Amino acid sequence: MSATLGRAFVQNFLGQAPAWYKYTIVAFLLINPLVALTLGPVTAGWLLLAEFIFTLAMALKCYPLQPGGLLAIEAVMIGLTSAETVLHKVVGNIEVMLLLIFMVAGIYFLKDLLLFMFTRILLGVKSKVTLSLLFCAAAALLSAFLDALTVTAVVIAVCTGFYGIYHKVASGKTFQQKHDHGDDTTVEELHREDLRRFRSFLRSLLMHAAVGTALGGVCTLVGEPQNLLIANKAGWEFGEFFLRMAPITLPVLVMGFFTCAFLEFSGSFGYGEDIPEKVRGIMRQYALEQDRKRTPQNRAALVIQAITAVWLVIGLATHAASVGLVGLTVIILATSFTGIIEEHRLGAAFEEALPFTALLTVFFAVVAVIADQQLFAPVIEYVLSLEKQVQGPAFYMANGILSAVSDNVFVATVYVDEVGQALLKNEIDRDTFDLLAVAINTGTNIPSVATPNGQAAFLFLLTSALAPLVRLSYGRMVIMALPYTIVMSITGLVMTATVLEPATDYLYENGWIQHHQVEDLQETPLIPGH
């Protein structure tokens, strides 16, 4: 009986994760206290950081909250940091937490409008190149004001819906009949080649849209969680953030669109497949049927969602309130005027963001270890000892490499904290801090499209129910992202090295942005325990 119970405990630990992964995490937890006792807290801190990055890289085996959280709890228990320092880090980044909790939930209630829009794009454009550019541009524009995860979720929902409709018809059923679109055994031979082509078509659209979320997400204060985190540290508001990033982000955006068009023209890296004409006909027939079924209540809800979306853009652009509170107003407006008043219907909106919000708190625990043990001090000192014109590109590359294998929010949190400490110690001046903050933000956002580990939206796509249906594996995603990674990363690096500083000086001279003081930074505490 006891042996059976023991096996049950082992099986329950980290659930469906592979046995080797479970043993690895247990080994980490056993080794860390021994290393702290024998080799000291600094070595243990570096080991913990490597272990935490491992949990992020293995996110497909097990969501990083549990293994990363166990490591963070142990770090506090063995004295690598304290609960007070962790709380200090969380409080200092409360606006980021509110963004994740309220803004993502708010956009959930605008999904019908977004679905309607993407459906119209998909059916209204016949040219695959134009369609790909529109999907990429629409995802970029939406991600500049909304949350990249939510935009990706909408694109997934649209593509899943269309895949399910065609798969149902290809299996000899009508729109109204129930059907398992994960089972290919019922697909008629006549439709098999069209189904293969349709899968390829959807894969390419999904990747264009996912990259679009990264292209737009880097541009504005709310596009990615780390943007707000960095803006809070620097004291930048919506307009200033956009202008400071523009010397890098706008050229990257243009080159991203050029890459999108080139990939569709050339048909390389798995792109170029058009939607089969038979499939398009079925989709159009289905859309017309849905339009006929739309009630006045449904249409009124779309109008309310559109008005709420306009308020969202105005609220963010004018900095009417902190980003998270603007998100809360979106929830209240969108639900009040569309009749969503039951608690369980509201609760569903928060499911998407809360796991990542919890994971972000674990990030801050690891950042607290880095701060207390001063792990990155030698790295930062080395980069700051370089010639001034080399510092920005050096930070861009360091962030880019780490963000390709780890989570970019975590990487940004670590580096902006360390550069902030350097400013408070008078090792750099405030203008240099602002330039380095731009390099850190773009370095964590742009090269991170290389793998699903870096971009939360990519990981979300890879782990969705749609990915296996359209045969989108980890390896295929990396290959399809490769041309984007190369073009966008090199463009960002060149702009950081050559254009960022003179463009920023031009913005200062013309009064578009203002010089900040060191005291502006100190409003968001950076020194652990103070």
UniProtKB/Swiss-Prot annotation:
It catalyses: 2 Na(+)(in) + 3 H(+)(out) = 2 Na(+)(out) + 3 H(+)(in). It is a multi-pass membrane protein. GO terms for molecular function: sodium:proton antiporter activity. GO terms for cellular component: plasma membrane. The chain crosses the membrane at residues 13-33, 67-87, 90-110, 138-158, 205-225, 245-265, 302-333, 350-370, 449-469, 477-497. Keywords: Antiport, Cell inner membrane, Cell membrane, Ion transport, Membrane, Sodium, Sodium transport, Transmembrane, Transmembrane helix, Transport. Pfam families: NhaB. It is found in: Cell inner membrane. InterPro entries: Na+/H+_antiporter_NhaB (IPR004671). PANTHER family: NA(+)_H(+) ANTIPORTER NHAB, TRANSPORTER ARSB-RELATED. Na(+)/H(+) antiporter that extrudes sodium in exchange for external protons. Belongs to the NhaB Na(+)/H(+) (TC 2.A.34) antiporter family. This is Na(+)/H(+) antiporter NhaB.
